[in-house]
């Protein structure tokens, strides 16, 4: 197996250089485009990429605006999408990256799957509601269902910070509202981000990485709020085809989503989707790619990708035979 690894840039919807990595196979059986979470970066997914390469899948990932090299190499602050229309630009960047991936693989007919973690799961869900035929399926890790009362509180406190601070200042109130209680369920915490994983080595590495764990601006949360709102209502799922493959994967002790993914999956089923699954991992927290039982997670991802790829092939073969 030969992997063509490269770091590159592509243009975002407004011309901004978006920094990305590819782990590309010459003849993959499928392709995965990954969207990372908040206050982290694409290079944390290298092991995941290598695992999927070994299973026969090409892997692509980019640093969102306000994250990783997309922020730093453009001399832009970490934790700030854009001064205007940040969420729309994040969605547009995914579209541009997908178009580049399709162009690079134009002679290969294989399914393209979307993987989204945490904030990336919100981006993924909003994207597939808007562009339901762009991907062959989606895997969502560390996802959450934001309640209407939570949306109301977020909107109120974002407005409060906007009024007293302005949009470009780092948020304190909203930041605390979202994250301050995440460690409370655990007795073994040494660092503020230990809720991410029960693997202390992984959380230590995150804590010591200057490209992780940064505070975000008031405008960032204002943009993110739009994504949360777009994905909060069942009516917004109606654009997705009923047989679109979707799986939610969460640590049972994840304070962000946890067992709430059961209700989240049910909401998609209520919208008419028939190919929705979920799995909870006992004792696991937010970042399944860094948990002690990550091998089980990797195996589940590969098995799901293989299963959905084969289902799609059977469907295509049946269509050809019926003609």
Language-model region placement:
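Short beta-strand/loop motif that positions the catalytic acidic residue
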Residues: 248-250
């Amino acid at each position: 197996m030969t992997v063509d690894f490269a770091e590159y840039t592509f243009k975002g919807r407004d011309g901004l250089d978006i920094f990305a990595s590819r782990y590309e196979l010459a003849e993959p059986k499928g392709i995965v485009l990954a969207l990372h979470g908040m206050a982290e970066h694409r290079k944390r997914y290298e092991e995941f990429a290598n695992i999927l390469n070994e299973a026969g899948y090409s892997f692509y990932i980019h640093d969102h605006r306000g994250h990783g090299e997309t922020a730093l190499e453009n001399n832009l602050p970490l934790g700030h999408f854009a001064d205007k229309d940040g969420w729309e630009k994040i969605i547009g960047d995914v579209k541009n990256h997908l178009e580049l991936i399709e162009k690079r693989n134009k002679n290969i007919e294989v399914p393209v799957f979307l993987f989204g973690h945490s904030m990336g799961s919100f981006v993924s869900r909003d994207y597939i509601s808007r562009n339901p035929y762009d991907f062959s399926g989606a895997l969502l890790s560390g996802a959450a269902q934001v309640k209407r009362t939570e949306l109301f509180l977020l909107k109120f406190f974002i407005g409060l910070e906007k009024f007293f601070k302005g949009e470009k200042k780092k948020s304190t109130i909203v930041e605390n509202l979202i994250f301050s209680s995440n460690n409370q369920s655990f007795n073994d915490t040494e660092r503020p981000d230990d809720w991410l994983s029960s693997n202390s080595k992984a959380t230590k590495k995150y804590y010591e990485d200057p490209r992780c764990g940064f505070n975000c601006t008031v405008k960032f949360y204002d943009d993110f709020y739009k994504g949360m709102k777009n994905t909060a209502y069942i009516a917004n799922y109606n654009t997705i085809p009923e047989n679109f493959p979707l799986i939610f994967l969460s640590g049972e002790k994840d304070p962000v989503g946890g067992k709430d993914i059961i209700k989240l999956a049910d909401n998609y089923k209520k919208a008419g989707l028939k190919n929705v699954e979920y799995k909870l991992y006992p004792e696991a927290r937010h970042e399944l790619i860094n948990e002690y039982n990550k091998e089980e997670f990797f195996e589940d991802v590969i098995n799901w990708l293989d299963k959905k790829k084969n289902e799609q092939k059977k469907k295509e073969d049946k269509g050809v035979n019926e003609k």
